């Protein structure tokens, strides 16, 4: 179990987040980085007491509201997909084959790390596959954190599909392709259970207000997120795929998970994935 303790982390810094926050009806609808209920913090931050104009006693500090309160009272997981590989470009099913980042993927990781470092992560946990570890490395250098690995964050095992293109899979395994179940590989439910359990283990060691970056893979992230959000299996496809080096953010408060961001990133990237 990853033990994560420390001071509460604030909301993302401007420019360090992607699309707007997806709220759940509690007033947290806002563009990334802004207070969820439209209230603007006083100069000096919500934790500073306001001084009266007469120079008298300070007024009580206003309690954080909306999105700021959510960040203070919850913890967050940044689910970061690895950078681009040659097999991504060629459209080959990677699965658990240990394919390294290409030069583009390395640049993507460096660029994304500069933004993610601004979120002040308390820990970095990665799949043990090389492309995930190489993606985590620039963030580890910037933050001074040590990367912890968890093999349960690996991509879906593709069995006989690994190394094949989608057209080759469709031709050789039409029945299995129709239901997206690789022969000798993992089902979507198995991936959701495995990767979802890994995220729950990480969350169990987190203190309120902390943020952990989890480096994983497209299908593993998508399916684990759908599992934690409580989606029925027939709606898992509603969570779309991730571009290389993009991330999603899950938050949890009072045992309830919610999706804060999905497929956020540094620049628009095409989705090159064997997930669907």
Each model region followed by its residue ranges:
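Short, conserved phosphate/pyrophosphate- and ester-handling motifs at nucleotide-, phospho-/glycolipid
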Residues: 82, 217
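Domain-level recognition of soluble alpha/beta enzyme cores
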Residues: 232-258
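Short glycine/proline- and acidic residue-enriched helix-loop micro-motifs
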Residues: 171-190
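Generic beta-sheet signal
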Residues: 77, 210-216
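Long, intrinsically disordered low-complexity tandem-repeat segments
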Residues: 26-52
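Acidic, His/Gly-rich catalytic cores of divalent-metal-dependent hydrolytic chemistry
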Residues: 260-276
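Loop-to-helix element that buttresses phosphate recognition and phosphoryl-transfer chemistry
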Residues: 78, 84-139, 184-196
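Phosphate-coordination/substrate-recognition cap region in phosphate-metabolizing enzymes
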Residues: 3-9, 14-19, 56-72, 111-172, ...
